[in-house]
């Protein structure tokens, strides 16, 4: 299961199920007023319930199609920011984030921290970019529910995102090499 993308070097990956859940940080933030100062327990609970329902439905479909995943890799702003917040990274250091692990308990602790702060106070949290403060609580809720519903107690965080993986795949195919994943992009000139 993944929030973002996944790329493992040196291994052939057989991608036999892909699903995008139509729920992101911004939508959850807006629906449950999570960028407000001290969001209500009702709104936080509602966000958890909505995320859990949508994640669990996708996970059931995935389980019907393929074997259980062995590793959860998180990429992008939420996952990398969680490491930066936990480790008080100021300034941000990608080398200290890449391939670092975070537990579900730590994600839940950071969620509590974010929920207890005003938006201005969230902007001042060490390790969190101010521009991410309005959506970080929602991202943390989404990631926590993905971890809970897929049975993962830990997450590996990668600085290499989905775009990086797509570039590697397209470059390999363009060079006539085997794709690092079992998926062959169709490369054609842009007109």
Regions found by a protein language model. Give the residues of each.
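Helical "lid/coupling" subdomains associated with nucleotide-phosphate turnover
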Residues: 3-191
């Amino acid at each position: 299961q993944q929030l973002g993308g996944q790329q493992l070097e040196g291994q052939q990956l057989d991608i036999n199920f892909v699903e995008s859940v139509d729920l992101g940080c911004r939508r959850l933030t807006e629906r449950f007023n999570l960028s407000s100062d001290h969001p209500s327990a009702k709104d936080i609970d509602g966000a958890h319930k909505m995320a859990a329902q949508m994640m669990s439905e996708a996970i059931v479909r995935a389980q019907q199609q393929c074997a259980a995943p062995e590793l959860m890799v998180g990429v992008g702003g939420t996952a990398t920011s969680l490491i930066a917040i936990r480790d008080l990274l100021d300034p941000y250091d990608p080398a200290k984030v890449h391939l670092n692990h975070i537990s579900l308990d730590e994600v839940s602790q950071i969620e509590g921290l974010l929920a207890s702060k005003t938006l201005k106070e969230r902007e001042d949290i060490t390790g969190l970019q101010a521009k991410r403060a309005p959506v970080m609580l929602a991202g943390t809720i989404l990631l926590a529910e993905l971890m809970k519903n897929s049975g993962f107690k830990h997450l590996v965080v990668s600085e290499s995102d989905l775009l990086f993986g797509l570039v590697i795949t397209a470059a390999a195919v363009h060079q006539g090499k085997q794709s690092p994943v079992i998926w062959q992009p169709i490369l054609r000139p842009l007109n």
